[in-house]
Amino acid sequence: MLPVRESLQKQVKILIGLGNLGFGGYRGLYTRFTNPNGFLEPASSDLLLINERRNLSVIGAVSRTFSVPSVSGPAFQVCGYHIDLLLSDPCKSMASLGSKSLFVDRHSASLVSKRFTGGMVSGDGPNRGRISMRLRGKDHNEKSTICAYFAYRGAKRWIYLNQQRRGMGFRGLHSSLSNRLSAGNAPDVSLDNSVTDEQVRDSSDSVAAKLCTKPLKLVSGSCYLPHPDKEATGGEDAHFICAEEQALGVADGVGGWAELGIDAGYYSRELMSNSVNAIQDEPKGSIDPARVLEKAHTCTKSQGSSTACIIALTNQGLHAINLGDSGFMVVREGHTVFRSPVQQHDFNFTYQLESGRNGDLPSSGQVFTVAVAPGDVIIAGTDGLFDNLYNNEITAIVVHAVRANIDPQVTAQKIAALARQRAQDKNRQTPFSTAAQDAGFRYYGGKLDDITVVVSYVAASKEEGKH
């Protein structure tokens, strides 16, 4: 669907293993290649190493291979993906790409209701369209950060919730939050109301002094579980972790583009790849996520649209930008002290970036500064996570993991596994079902979707990777 640019000079072929649905694990195929753009085509099982040769190992059955065209750019670590294995070194850089299906926003600080009818809204150009029910949503030196980048071809299947409830009108929700918030005045907006404004302010103030004397680092791990129906082809989610630069990002391609014959997974993958490239140009220790997203959006030309959340630990604290219904939360001493709010134009119509100026712009994203200290845990994810787990459920897993000295990779897997379990439970109340009921639907249970989870432990920089 997307033409391969003439400038692509080399290819690196990645072995990708697919297993039974369960936990998502990663084992790196360690090599260096340049600027993977995530455009996937069928390939043979040969493995071509670019720039230098290293020992490669694949653990688990390998059943499918892809090739990733590349152009000159920063070095990456290529990761294999195997769903039924719990494999990975949490100290290694990780990234993965995934999928998307249904709709709905669930947490928002202040909501304005209005009524509209879902359906197709025409856009600019003969091949453009906006699906209001689901369209949500350079030269580098040799010492570039080693990042992991793992690509999947996006699935082309999408399900409208209102197809099960045709003829029903529904209320739209619109977030009226300001575009720039700080941890001092941004409340936790989860449905379980576990944190108040005063708690956030007090916690942030008490941590701020610690930042002045303690250089910090992020120790991160990730897990991705595709929608069961999209396991073979991947999906529309994407994420990256840059360990050296202390940055990470998640994106959720809007599956509704499949109705127009467009795979939005290309867009989210290219957006995250361009975000990694932009991070390489940022001053060390002073990454500006908003500037990174602006550059990445400008460079992303694939058709489709996506949500985006980029987070960076800098000398001044945790900086982030979030656009749409992906997001992140910060857990401290067993409590959720911060949760990024969801952005959406109307019910089931999230903010989304799109190539050109047809969608929302990066400037519409909400920018956050959060004071953090050693012992804090950051959880970032797509709506497949936050639609199915309340804040206190995520926090409970984090508390257990910290006490048991479990690394962030396994913690991410445990969170993703519980989110998948909740998604398949037709009787349990979830953030998704609560939001649907508030919008006038008789809906119970979770929302089956792609699930991307990134867990980062905040540690003193002198520590060796354990929380």
UniProtKB/Swiss-Prot annotation:
UniProt xrefs under Pfam families: PP2C_2
Keyword annotations of the record: Hydrolase, Magnesium, Manganese, Metal-binding, Protein phosphatase
Broad enzyme group: hydrolase
Binding-site residues, Mn(2+) 1: D252, G253
Domain PPM-type phosphatase per the UniProt entry, residue ranges: 222-458
Entry keyword annotation includes Hydrolase: yes
Cofactor(s) in the UniProt record: Mg(2+); Mn(2+)
Catalytic activity: O-phospho-L-seryl-[protein] + H2O = L-seryl-[protein] + phosphate; O-phospho-L-threonyl-[protein] + H2O = L-threonyl-[protein] + phosphate
SUPFAM superfamilies named in the record: PP2C-like
GO molecular function: metal ion binding; protein serine/threonine phosphatase activity
Cofactor note: Binds 2 magnesium or manganese ions per subunit.
Gene3D superfamilies cross-referenced by the UniProt entry: PPM-type phosphatase domain (3.60.40.10)
Family stated for the protein in its record: Belongs to the PP2C family.
Protein name: Probable protein phosphatase 2C 55
